[in-house]
Amino acid sequence: MKIIRSKDFTAARPWGALDIASMNGITTRLHWTNEPYKWHVNDGQEVFAVLDGRVEMRYREDGREQSTILEAGDIFYAAVGTEHVALPIGPARILVVETAGSV
């Protein structure tokens, strides 16, 4: 049993993570960041839940770039093949559930 206070977690570097669980090839990790990630496409599904802070999520659908602001409590689901990039608006803590070893 473990209790994690997400607001208390700060990584040593942007997108640093606290590994929470690995179940049947799926990982659950708490990330801290204050810098953008990179455009990428996951090889599996991804669940991206903002726990603290705000994140601009940019993604491409039908070749068009779109954007939405995710607030604390919001969840972004990326299906296989969804190209996307997360840009935090200040420090943010994000719970990510995805295939182990995904970008």
Where are these regions (language model features)?
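A short, N-terminal "cap"/entry segment at the start of jelly-roll beta-barrel domains
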Residues: 1-30
